[in-house]
Amino acid sequence: MLTRKQFELLKFINERLKEAGVPPSFDEMKDALDLRSKSGIHRLITALEERGFIRRLPNRARAIEVIKLPDLGGNSGARRGFTPSVIEGNLGKVRPPSPQHAEDDSDRNVAVPVMGRIAAGTPIEALQTRSHTISVPPDMLGSGEHYALEVRGDSMMDAGILDGDMALIQRNESADTGDIVVALIDEEEATLKRFRRRGASIALEPANSAYEVRILPPNRVRIQGKLIGLYRKY
């Protein structure tokens, strides 16, 4: 499923290709969608490419090919399990402890800063400002420094990571193949994906067949942490 802006941009590009034989410029796209900056267009283009609707052709200016148009039929897809631990219930709160251990449990919990939102879908601008904290049992964290990000999007749903989940992240600048990571792309966009190496390149894999794998050179990707657990609100 596309957002309204993604659909509008895809429609505009497709119509321009049919009329003129060349795609519109980023300035024309920005004006057509009434956006303030071209960075918003860049994010929409990336989303359409990830989902397999368009392809950017290398070494050619303004080279965008429309591969398909939206299929209005739905496909929910199977949701498979996710191995890191999940605390379910009220967001940011563990289950009430028994009265005799209430004080001890409260003292043991760790306050983890929430640093903003992370995209499980379209890469979104990375936020570096702490907004609040959530209380996490220490045995869920292990060693190192940790932070939390609110998940936006559905590209990791088949790994059990859902829109609205709070992702618990261990700060790390490296990752092993198969890790689910916070990846910063081009120093401005953050996304939550499964990390793999493909030869000299890095693959950022979604866990949703509606999205495409992104293959990027290492100099465009910086690992900012690894997923170790989830908070989920019902």
Swiss-Prot record:
DNA-binding region extent: 26-46
EC number from the UniProt entry: 3.4.21.88
Positions of the record's site feature: Cleavage: 120-121
Cross-referenced Pfam families: LexA_DNA_bind (PF01726), Peptidase_S24 (PF00717)
UniProt record, GO biological process: DNA repair; DNA replication; negative regulation of DNA-templated transcription; proteolysis; SOS response
SUPFAM superfamilies: LexA/Signal peptidase (SSF51306), Winged helix' DNA-binding domain (SSF46785)
Originating organism: Rhodopseudomonas palustris (strain HaA2)
Name of the protein in its database record: LexA repressor
Protein family according to the UniProt entry: Belongs to the peptidase S24 family.
Transmembrane annotation, as ranges: none
Gene3D superfamilies assigned: Umud Fragment, subunit A, Winged helix-like DNA-binding domain superfamily/Winged helix DNA-binding domain
Active site, UniProt feature: 155, 193
Subunit structure: Homodimer.
